[in-house]
Regions:
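Conserved small/polar residues in nucleotide/adenosyl-binding loops
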Residues: 231-236
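Extreme N-terminal starter segment of soluble prokaryotic enzymes
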Residues: 1-4
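Core catalytic region of metal-dependent phosphoesterases/phosphodiesterases
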Residues: 7, 19-98
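Short acidic, glycine-rich surface-loop motifs adjacent to enzyme active sites
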Residues: 10, 34-42, 115-119, 137-157
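Conserved beta-sheet core of the metallophosphoesterase superfamily
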Residues: 34-36, 55-66, 76-88, 156-227
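Catalytic metal-binding/acid-base residues of hydrolase active sites
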Residues: 11, 40-42, 69-71, 91-92, ...
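Binuclear metal-dependent hydrolase catalytic cores centered on His/Asp/Glu-rich metal-binding motifs
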Residues: 25-26, 99-146
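Acidic/histidine-rich helix-loop elements
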Residues: 11-17, 41-48, 120-128
Length: 236
């Protein structure tokens, strides 16, 4: 049996430290063959850098996926092309730099992973995630024994729809972006594993990894606030 761990959005230094401490231990204790992590919030909660990506990979992560914060860190667009274990969303415009998938290999078994961005309530230019996923699955079929699809999206309806759309054609469809895990993990009728959102790796007593008080204040008075990462909570 092949075992794969998918790690939800790594949020800032607290999330990185937890992932880098837990992943090696989980690989040993659970006998994991593959570890995939979403790293798009690794740099202070917004984006990633080459140095941070290398650190996460060196901790035992096999592939890093990204989402709508992919370009938040200045200069990252000049580094991503050299990192073939990091993939940006596949449905970004074709001119964007970087890899649109990663293929991992262990024990004679290959797993392909790619991400698509949702388009509902997402403020980023992206092509149709359904058609893009169709094209990616056709392209990767024959190159890998299993295909894991991440949908980085806001709307649960869009995530569920993609799960049903790909049921029986891929190994798993896993949602990210909201930082809140959903209680709907299941295997769809044709055999595809599905979960709307796997949650985050970051501070527990927070609002999506941020300090609570400024977020509440912003909701109540509508005034601009600085949403800082929370560093004083245990992580999940």
């Amino acid at each position: 049996m092949i075992k794969l761990l998918f790690v939800g959005d790594i949020v800032g230094k607290p999330g990185r430290e937890m992932a880098e401490e837990r992943v090696p231990r989980m690989r040993r204790e659970l006998g994991l063959d593959f570890v995939v992590a979403n790293g798009e919030n690794a740099a202070a909660g917004a984006g990633i850098t080459g140095a941070l990506a290398r650190s996460i990979l060196e901790s035992g992560v096999d592939a890093i996926t990204l989402g709508d914060h992919v370009w938040d860190q200045r200069g990252w667009e000049n580094e991503i092309g050299a990192m073939d274990r990091v993939c940006r969303p596949a449905n970004l415009p074709a001119a964007c730099p970087g890899w649109d998938h990663v293929i991992m290999a262990a024990r004679g078994f290959k797993v392909a992973v790619f991400t698509v961005l949702g388009r509902q309530y997402m403020n980023m230019k992206a092509e149709d995630p359904f058609r893009c996923a169709d094209l990616m699955v056709e392209r990767l079929r024959g190159q890998a024994d299993a295909i894991v699809v991440e949908i980085h999206a806001e709307a649960t309806s869009e995530k569920q729809a993609l799960g049903w759309h790909l049921d029986g054609r891929v190994t798993a469809v896993l949602g990210t972006h909201t930082h809140v895990p959903t209680a709907d993990a299941c295997v769809l009728p044709k055999g595809t594993a599905f979960m709307c959102d796997v949650g985050m790796t970051g501070p527990y007593a927070s609002v999506l990894g941020r300090e609570v008080v400024p977020v509440i204040s912003r909701f109540m008075d509508g005034m601009p606030k600085r949403f800082c990462l929370l560093y004083t909570s245990r992580c999940v």
